[in-house]
């Protein structure tokens, strides 16, 4: 007699870089016969329903999205990017959303209970609304909680020679200063929710709270952790477009033959959140405007977006509003982007080295430091690059074989990790 699969209650903060990896794995679970309820913001309702999930919306403070964050965290407009802003964002955006997140999670669990079914919760690093479960807050309990690591790991790590940007995050005093306000807020919130246990230091609680923590990267892209909790393990990257069974674009752009025939293809994007094309994309176009043997494809990151009329697009450049990375990257020599964690995984899954221009914005320094440490990336160390800086970086990466060699090594490592299988194994263990 077959064991009935638990209902999966997936949860993600309503930001593209957080929803994307969870939804990618959820699609795989749906294909394997799981029923999925997805808790996230209304901005992602359509995507969640299209995937085949039951949608449960976040409410109030938790229902934000990329473009209205200053409304709930006005300090983002005045505090410069860096550690202070990181600590502020952690508290104002993520910790203070816990009550509404937990409320939505309970709504989802009640729906599952009403059908006399069991549930396993799958969250992601910054969906802190799963913490009340392990801390004894009143409410329904799932059979287990799995958290997916959708951002660079924040556990204590050994020093990494040659990566000075990591030093502040390793220093215990700095970690305490930056994240103590968030820790204090979480303690107060847990009291309000009726939790019977007090949370640990915030950065530790994120990893010790779930039954299983699956970091979505291979070991080679993470610093050597000093003391990860028992449930922590690596799971490789989330399935990308093709491996997740999604359809390729219904029609390729008219310039697609140019991609296939290009001697050298450079792909550049600024992601979907921090979009000022003058920071990185336009300088990249300008950097190679006179190189006939190079094709530059710029992805604007938002459907319907276009460059200002004042921007002259070089003859060797092609601009597209929105396009799957996995269609272009197999043909690319280098990927220039703003340092999102998912973008790094996408690029390296195709063996393509990266150039990162994210400056000190949110988790971008953490991603860049790992790319540099692993030898697969070049950090521009600024949010506002010049064409000269971009040109210098690309020339160094293309002229240094080790970048490509190490990127290919990570690609092979990623191929050994079957993230969907690893996730399903964890689900089975908790549901048995």
Swiss-Prot record:
GO terms for molecular function: sterol 3-beta-glucosyltransferase activity. Pfam families: EryCIII-like_C, Glyco_transf_28. InterPro entries: EryCIII-like_C, GlycoTrans_28_N, UDP_glucos_trans. Keywords: Glycosyltransferase, Transferase. It comes from the Eukaryota. It is an enzyme of class 2 (transferase). The keyword Disulfide bond does not apply. Induction: Induced in early stationary phase (at protein level). Its EC number is 2.4.1.-. GO terms for biological process: carbohydrate metabolic process; lipid glycosylation. It catalyses: (9Z)-17-hydroxyoctadec-9-enoate 17-O-beta-D-glucoside + UDP-alpha-D-glucose = (9Z)-17-hydroxyoctadec-9-enoate 17-O-sophoroside + UDP + H(+). Catalyzes the second glycosylation step of sophorolipid biosynthesis, the further glucosylation of the previoulsy formed glucolipid to give rise to an acidic sophorolipid. Belongs to the UDP-glycosyltransferase family. PANTHER family: GLYCOSYLTRANSFERASE, UDP-N-ACETYLGLUCOSAMINE--N-ACETYLMURAMYL-(PENTAPEPTIDE) PYROPHOSPHORYL-UNDECAPRENOL N-ACETYLGLUCOSAMINE TRANSFERASE 1. This is UDP-glucosyltransferase B1. It comes from Starmerella bombicola (Yeast).
């Amino acid at each position: 007699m077959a064991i009935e699969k638990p209902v999966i209650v997936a949860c993600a903060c309503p930001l593209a870089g957080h929803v994307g990896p969870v939804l990618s794995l959820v699609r795989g679970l749906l294909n394997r016969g799981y029923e999925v309820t997805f808790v996230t913001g209304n901005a992602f309702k359509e995507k969640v329903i299209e995937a085949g999930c039951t949608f449960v919306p976040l409410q109030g403070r938790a229902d934000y999205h990329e473009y209205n964050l200053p409304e709930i965290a006005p300090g983002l407009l005045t505090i410069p990017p860096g550690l202070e802003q990181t600590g502020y964002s952690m508290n104002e955006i993520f910790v203070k959303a816990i009550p509404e997140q937990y409320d939505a999670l309970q709504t989802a669990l009640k729906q599952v209970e009403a059908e006399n079914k069991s549930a396993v919760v799958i969250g992601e690093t910054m969906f802190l609304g799963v913490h009340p479960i392990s801390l004894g807050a009143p409410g329904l309990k799932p059979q287990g909680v799995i958290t997916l690591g959708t951002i660079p790991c924040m556990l204590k790590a050994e020093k990494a020679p040659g990566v000075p940007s990591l030093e502040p995050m390793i220093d215990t005093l700095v970690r305490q200063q930056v994240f103590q306000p968030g820790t204090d807020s979480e303690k107060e919130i847990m009291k309000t929710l009726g939790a019977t246990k007090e949370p640990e230091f915030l950065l530790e609680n994120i990893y010790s709270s779930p039954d299983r923590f699956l970091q979505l990267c291979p070991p080679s892209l993470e610093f050597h952790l000093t003391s990860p909790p028992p449930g922590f393990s690596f799971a490789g990257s989330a399935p990308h477009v093709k491996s997740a069974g999604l359809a390729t674009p219904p029609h390729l752009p008219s310039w697609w033959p140019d991609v296939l025939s290009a001697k050298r293809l450079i792909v550049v994007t600024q992601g979907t959140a921090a979009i000022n094309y003058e920071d990185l994309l336009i300088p990249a176009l300008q950097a190679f405007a006179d190189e006939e043997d190079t094709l530059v494809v710029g992805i604007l990151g938002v459907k319907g977006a276009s460059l200002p009329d004042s921007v002259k697009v070089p003859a060797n450049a092609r601009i597209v509003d929105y396009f799957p990375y996995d269609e272009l990257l197999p043909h690319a020599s280098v990927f220039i982007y703003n340092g999102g964690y998912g973008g790094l995984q996408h690029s390296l899954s195709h063996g393509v080295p990266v150039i990162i221009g994210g400056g000190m914005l949110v988790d971008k320094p953490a991603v860049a430091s790992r790319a540099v440490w692993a030898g697969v990336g070049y950090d521009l160390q600024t949010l506002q690059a010049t064409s000269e800086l971009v040109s210098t970086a690309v020339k160094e990466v293309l002229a240094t074989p080790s970048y490509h060699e190490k990127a290919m090594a990570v690609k092979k490592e990623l191929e050994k990790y079957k993230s969907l299988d690893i996730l399903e194994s964890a689900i089975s263990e908790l549901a048995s």
